Amino acid sequence: MKLVVDASAIAALYVPEERSEQAERAVSQAQELHTLDLAAYEVANDLWKHARRGLLREDEASNMLEELWEFFKALKVHSYAEVLKDAFALALKHGVTVYDAAYVALAEKIGGKLLTLDRQLAEKFPALVTP
């Protein structure tokens, strides 16, 4: 299965949360992993927030960023430019952010499923989201 992994799912692989195991399981079962280039910035920003709030030490966040970089090497990383127009249309139609809609547009484009831990996004696109 082709799987598009959004920033929320990638972040859960590094910063444990209640649905981290779900993300790990889906990633391990996928035949192809895809994401958008913007995911690196989104996840790095999430690590930064955790460090700023004292939930992670700065060295922990930096180490996680290095691990994230290695993980991205195993992904097929797509440019936002590939899906921007479709993402914008989906965002307007479904009332989600263009950021979130971009992952949906990528899943549609490659004929894959979307792994997201964003419940609102999953509810808006249940046919595309992997459980």
Curated annotation (Swiss-Prot):
Activity control: Inhibited by EDTA.
Keywords: Hydrolase, Magnesium, Metal-binding, Nuclease, Toxin-antitoxin system
Residues that coordinate or bind Mg(2+): 6, 100, 118
Domain of life of the source: Archaea
Residue ranges annotated for the PINc domain, each copy included: 4-121
Molecular function terms from GO: magnesium ion binding; RNA nuclease activity
Enzyme class: hydrolase
EC number from the UniProt entry: 3.1.-.-
InterPro entries xref list: PIN-like_dom_sf, PIN_dom, PIN_Pae0151-like, TypeII_TA_RNase_PINc/VapC, VapC_family
Requisite cofactors: Mg(2+)
UniProt record similarity statement: Belongs to the PINc/VapC protein family.
Function, as annotated: Toxic component of a type II toxin-antitoxin (TA) system. Has ribonuclease activity.
Quaternary structure and partners: Homodimer. Forms a complex with putative antitoxin VapB3, possibly VapB(2)-VapC(2).
PANTHER family, alphabetized: EXONUCLEASE VAPC9, RIBONUCLEASE VAPC3
Name of the protein in question: Ribonuclease VapC3
Gene giving rise to this polypeptide: vapC3
